[in-house]
Every structure is written in structure tokens, then in C-alpha cells.
């Protein structure tokens, strides 16, 4: 199955690190990126073929929590898994309450990321 992943993080280096891990995964065929939740919402409207979102919480403009609220308010997005990647474990409950499917602590390990991708896209 071809898979398109959207990486949402305001930190350029974090986006590139995640992309490097994703490029090594044979399931991932395309990678899109967004600097904040607003950019991510725009990309999702323009490209409904995205299969998975990897989302940071702390971002300018529209943060990860606000993105989740807006994104999940549209029921047509219910089938798209969102995995939150964050250094802040204290916000786990908040991200799940707002529609995240899963949570990975940064720095993300390749095996953990691949496990979650398999879990949510199989």
C-alpha cells in the first residue's frame, strides 16, 4: 500500500529528522511537511490522499492541540490517524482528549515510529 505522511513541526531540524526516518520505511511513499497547524490544515484540504499525520504540539500560529480540535471537528477526517510527537509527556491526556490516536516522546526512535505506523495504517 502506498502511504503519504504529513509531518507537522515548526522546527526545521525536527521535520528533517522525522523525514529521514520515514524515507527508510518501505511503506512510506511520499512525505509532505507543514510548519504549523494552519499550514497542515491547508495541506489536508488540498490533498485528501494523506494517510497519516505526525504532529508536534508546541507551534506558532495554530498549535497541535488547536489543529486537532479543528481537524477532528470534520468527520470526513475521522479515518486519518494522528500521532503526536512531543517532549512534553504532561499533555498526553489533552492530546488524546482532542482526537490524537497515539503519542510518541521525542526524540523519536526509528523502531517505535515504525511500530506506530504499522499499528495505525495496517
Spans of model-derived segments:
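Helix N-cap/capping motif at the beta->alpha junctions
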Residues: 33-42, 64
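Short amphipathic alpha-helix used as the core "switch/output" element in two-component signaling
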Residues: 42, 65-78
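Alpha4 helix (beta4-alpha4-beta5 surface) of REC/receiver domains from two-component response regulators
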Residues: 66, 88-102, 115
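Hydrophobic/aromatic residues positioned on beta-strands within the core alpha/beta folds
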Residues: 83-86
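C-terminal output helix
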Residues: 108-119
Amino acid at each position: 500500500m502506498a502511504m503519504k505522511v504529513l509531518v507537522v513541526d515548526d522546527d526545521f531540524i525536527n521535520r528533517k529528522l522525522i523525514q529521514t526516518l520515514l524515507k527508510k520505511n518501505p511503506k512510506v511513499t511520499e512525505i509532505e511537511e507543514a510548519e504549523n497547524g494552519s499550514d497542515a490544515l491547508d495541506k489536508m484540504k488540498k490533498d485528501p490522499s494523506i494517510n497519516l499525520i505526525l504532529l508536534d504540539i508546541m507551534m506558532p500560529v495554530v498549535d497541535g492541540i488547536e489543529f486537532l480540535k479543528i481537524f477532528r471537528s470534520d468527520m470526513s477526517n475521522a479515518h486519518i490517524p494522528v500521532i503526536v510527537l512531543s517532549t512534553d509527556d504532561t499533555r498526553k491526556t489533552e492530546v488524546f482528549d482532542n482526537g490524537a490516536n497515539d503519542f510518541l516522546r521525542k526524540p523519536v526512535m526509528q523502531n517505535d515510529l515504525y511500530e506506530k505506523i504499522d499499528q495505525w495504517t495496517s
